[in-house]
Amino acid sequence: MSQNTNQSSVPPAPLFQFSDQRLQYQGRTVLDKLSLSIASGERVALIGESGAGKSTLLKALREQCPDQVAWCPQQPGLVPILSTFHNIYMGALDSHSLAYNLINLIKPLPGALNIVQPIAKQLGLEQQLFSSTDKLSGGQQQRTSIGRALIQQRGIFLGDEPVANVDEYQGEALLQLICQNHETVVLALHDIAQALSICTRIIGLQDGAIVLDAPSEQLQA
């Protein structure tokens, strides 16, 4: 009986973990002696000035378990000549055969439409579904990038300023949508109020180190 109790009290292994590690970008040390763990189910905001290491840390997190991560980069990275539909669908390419993907590129297939259309509707992109993404606004392009991540249906979402190009109200709604669809979320955010509202844990980066790591509720007290 006591053995089972002891086993149940052991915390789960961290999803991500760094122990006294150095993270570099283009040969330059960005974060030094980094010790950090993130558990499954956490919603973490990375805050800090430009160049503090948020993007570098997200890249390192992604490299730890790439097959489990839906990734939303700071620059949407869309294919401009393709439609919103096709750019969202790109997140699901690995789930289908090459032949299926080629046919769907020429003419959207019903099965693919049934998956993409609800995502586009949630993102407010249903009217732009068959517009080429070079015709979209910056905010619409960013929402398309989020859609490409959502369609992957992975447990972890990593986002580098994923709502920087939309207004505060839209950003809040998009971040809620992201959190509803992923068990674990790590976001680089510049809006501290937004970070406190959406995330359960805040990590602050400055001068190559973690200078803040606290529950959101503690910082709002």
Task: Report each predicted region and the residues it spans.
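Hydrophobic anchor residue at the start of the ABC signature
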Residues: 146
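H-loop/switch region of ABC-family ATPase nucleotide-binding domains
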Residues: 189-190
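Conserved ABC ATPase "signature" region
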Residues: 102-128
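Conserved beta-strand-loop-alpha-helix hinge in the C-terminal portion
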Residues: 209-221
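A short, surface-exposed alpha-helical micro-motif characterized by mixed small hydrophobic
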Residues: 195-197
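Conserved ABC ATPase signature
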Residues: 132-136, 140
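Catalytic Walker B motif of ABC-type/P-loop ATPase nucleotide-binding domains
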Residues: 157-160
